[in-house]
């Protein structure tokens, strides 16, 4: 785009899970091109987690009731579709719900395994009378978009296993509009305004970053076309392929200290790709994430040939105070003892 001013992106927080993003200036017409692409990607292609099947003790199919439970099984399934969960595991995981009446059963009564979080614990599931008892086994998987129950029905599944419609998308609503903006003497450039509302499992900022990353990978196919080349190869170069593979790595593979790892996980950063989309300023805004944690992250990314969004290309790990680049270890005067992070982890759990 022949614009003398580089486009910028700003964010305005509207509500807890809703933000308004402004991208300007864009060439005339590009506001709708970019806005439509981002909206469709946000609504259909952001990965998330959802319940794919359940098994209720004493129940063989969904067209029945559970003794002592006000809601029938169909109502319970409908309620469980509203469960907002996130999972760090790419493989199916199992959660358990066990509740004895009388009382109300909520999502907070579900016991998730490590790496799985229930984000709406107050959600109503069922109501039990004095003799009511509810035991449910829930399978959670990661995916994209919407998958009907019929596709979640596994061949050879155990008797009593009930498949559930899965709504993986963590994005609830996306709207956009394009307004005119001025660049020097021209007033016909585009200003794109995108309003994004998400579930509690992801922030609007992270959702937009994920959508942008998906589009960059797809548009990279067209960038590979070169009319001067004798042979046109569709796909990323070997170096770019390595980077793309690195983006998909979980941050667990960076072998970060407990302090840095816990802070990033709490912020919703699960992959290297989500990490490199952040600036140093973004990371410093995270509670308990200081400059030494920034240095540690930059060093780990440098080992993969990557960097934070605003890190200079000339970054040299040997210039980081307290870090021995030759041995890959921190000295005792590094600002905080990296071996003492277990105390930090225990404090975080209190």
UniProtKB/Swiss-Prot annotation:
Coiled coil: none annotated. Residues 1-226 are annotated as: Alpha N-terminal domain (alpha-NTD). GO terms for cellular component: cytoplasm; DNA-directed RNA polymerase complex. Transmembrane segments: none annotated. It catalyses: RNA(n) + a ribonucleoside 5'-triphosphate = RNA(n+1) + diphosphate. It is an enzyme of class 2 (transferase). Residues 328-350 are annotated as: Disordered. Keywords: DNA-directed RNA polymerase, Nucleotidyltransferase, Transcription, Transferase. GO terms for biological process: DNA-templated transcription. Residues 241-350 are annotated as: Alpha C-terminal domain (alpha-CTD). The keyword Cytoplasm does not apply. InterPro entries: DNA-dir_RNA_pol_insert (IPR011262), DNA-dir_RNA_pol_RpoA/D/Rpb3 (IPR011263), DNA-dir_RpoA (IPR011773), RBP11-like (IPR036603), RNAP_asu_C (IPR011260), RNApol_insert_sf (IPR036643). One of its GO terms (molecular function) is DNA binding. Its EC number is 2.7.7.6. DNA-dependent RNA polymerase catalyzes the transcription of DNA into RNA using the four ribonucleoside triphosphates as substrates. The N-terminal domain is essential for RNAP assembly and basal transcription, whereas the C-terminal domain is involved in interaction with transcriptional regulators and with upstream promoter elements. Homodimer. The RNAP catalytic core consists of 2 alpha, 1 beta, 1 beta' and 1 omega subunit. When a sigma factor is associated with the core the holoenzyme is formed, which can initiate transcription. Belongs to the RNA polymerase alpha chain family. This is DNA-directed RNA polymerase subunit alpha. It comes from Mycolicibacterium smegmatis (strain ATCC 700084 / mc(2)155). The gene is rpoA.
């Amino acid at each position: 785009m022949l614009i003398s001013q580089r486009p910028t992106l700003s964010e305005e927080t509207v509500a807890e899970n809703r933000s308004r993003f402004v991208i300007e200036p864009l060439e005339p017409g590009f506001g709708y091109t970019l806005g439509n692409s981002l909206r469709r990607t946000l609504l259909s292609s952001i990965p998330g987690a959802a319940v794919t099947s359940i098994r209720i003790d004493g129940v063989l199919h969904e067209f029945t009731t559970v003794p002592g439970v006000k809601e029938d099984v169909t109502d319970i399934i409908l309620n469980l579709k509203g469960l907002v969960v996130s999972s760090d595991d790419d493989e199916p995981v199992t959660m358990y719900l066990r509740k004895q009446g009388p009382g109300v059963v909520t999502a907070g009564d579900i016991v998730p395994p490590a790496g799985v979080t229930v984000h709406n614990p107050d959600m109503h599931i069922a109501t039990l009378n004095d003799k009511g008892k509810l035991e449910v086994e829930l399978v959670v998987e990661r995916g994209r978009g919407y998958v009907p129950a019929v596709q979640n029905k596994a061949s050879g599944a155990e008797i009593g296993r009930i498949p559930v419609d899965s709504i993986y998308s963590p994005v609830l609503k996306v709207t956009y509009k394009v307004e005119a903006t001025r660049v020097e003497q021209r007033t016909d450039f585009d200003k794109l305004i995108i309003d994004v509302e998400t579930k509690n499992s992801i922030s609007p900022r992270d959702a937009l970053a994920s959508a942008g990353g998906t589009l960059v990978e797809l548009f990279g196919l067209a960038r590979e076309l070169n009319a001067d080349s004798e042979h046109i190869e569709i796909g990323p170069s070997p170096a770019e392929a390595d980077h793309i593979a690195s983006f998909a790595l979980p941050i667990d593979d960076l072998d970060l200290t407990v302090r840095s790892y816990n802070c990033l996980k709490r912020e919703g950063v699960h992959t290297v790709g989500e990490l490199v989309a952040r600036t140093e300023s973004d990371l410093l805004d995270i509670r308990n994430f200081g400059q030494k944690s920034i240095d540690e992250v930059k060093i780990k990314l440098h080992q993969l040939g990557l960097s934070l969004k605003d890190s200079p290309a000339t970054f040299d790990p040997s210039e980081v105070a307290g870090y021995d680049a030759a041995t890959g270890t921190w000295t005792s005067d590094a600002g905080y003892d990296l071996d003492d992070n277990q105390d930090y982890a225990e404090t975080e759990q209190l």
